[in-house]
């Protein structure tokens, strides 16, 4: 019986830590991105649009971020008012709304990427490469269990395969964007290789 109590206490501790850390990370991201003119939510929507490929639908953005379409619609409403995105009706399905970033958003996003990257590296710096890989696998395991809870009977293996491809693609794009945003990266843009 004592083992069950210890086990349950550990589960509650992990749950509490996850919630608390997510909140803390969001505050840090808001600060880092805020210095560049974006909120964490705005940055995340722009990252989703960039990953999906503009234009991106509200439902696509919501799925990519892991939020409800209603919450994304409210964020996009505020982004439209701030001049960060344009909203258009899909030509093939008028019920669908697409989101495209403005040049203002593109500029702010480019400035915010290095700030976010600096924060991410700072937070992850105490972890070895092996610890990071283990941490990623553990978080993915929990994510897939949560996905299965919300979507009983869905093909989790297909989701895992899709996530693997998506993560590689996203990492390549973010690395490219970070390098172009860095001062040394800007010097090499447009130069021909000999």
Question: Model segments located where?
Answer:
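Pre-recognition alpha-helix immediately N-terminal to the DNA-recognition helix
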Residues: 13, 17, 24, 28, ...
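N-terminal leader segment of winged-helix/HTH proteins
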Residues: 1-36, 168-194
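Terminal interaction helix/tail motif
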Residues: 114-194
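N-terminal helix-turn-helix DNA-binding core of bacterial DNA-binding proteins
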Residues: 27-68, 82, 154
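Short, locally clustered residues in the helix-turn-helix/winged-helix DNA-binding domain
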Residues: 19, 47-53, 113, 140
């Amino acid at each position: 019986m004592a083992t069950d109590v210890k086990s349950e206490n550990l589960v509650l501790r992990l749950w509490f830590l996850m919630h608390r850390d997510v909140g803390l990370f969001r505050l840090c991201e808001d600060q880092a991105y805020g210095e560049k003119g974006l909120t964490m939510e705005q940055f995340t929507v722009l990252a989703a649009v960039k990953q999906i490929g503009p234009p991106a639908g509200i439902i696509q953005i919501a799925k990519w971020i892991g939020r409800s379409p209603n919450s994304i619609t409210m964020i996009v409403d505020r982004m439209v008012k701030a001049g960060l995105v344009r909203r258009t009706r899909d030509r093939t399905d008028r019920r669908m709304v697409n989101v495209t970033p403005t040049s203002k958003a593109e500029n702010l996003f480019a400035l915010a990427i290095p700030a976010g990257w600096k924060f991410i590296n700072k937070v992850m710096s105490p972890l070895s490469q092996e610890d990071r890989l283990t941490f990623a696998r553990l978080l993915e395991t929990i994510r897939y269990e949560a996905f299965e809870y919300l979507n009983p009977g869905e093909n989790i293996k297909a989701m895992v395969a899709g996530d693997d491809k998506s993560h590689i693609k996203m990492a390549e794009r973010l690395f490219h964007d970070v390098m172009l945003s860095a001062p040394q990266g800007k010097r090499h843009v447009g130069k021909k290789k000999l």
